[in-house]
């Protein structure tokens, strides 16, 4: 019998992994040095980080050991810091185009939350 953690953690881990892979394929096909605002970037401004967070959350539920909980906590602490620095760089690089994008795609990581 599967535990509740396994029933939730396994699909989240798979979903996060699939989303990371889909992001990578999208990025390889579309990035040419210009700001991308379509595809997964039309939902959140940092789709790779969102995918990775889903993956790590799933792992923390699926493999209930202190190390995966620590990985989740570190991920939750580091991703927002990294996003902040990355967005400063994107504003410098793309200027007003990135500002318009930020207004249009309000959520950095999790729609409706952050």
Model-assigned labels for residue ranges:
Residues 3-114:
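Cytosolic-biased juxtamembrane loops and peripheral soluble domains of multi-pass membrane proteins
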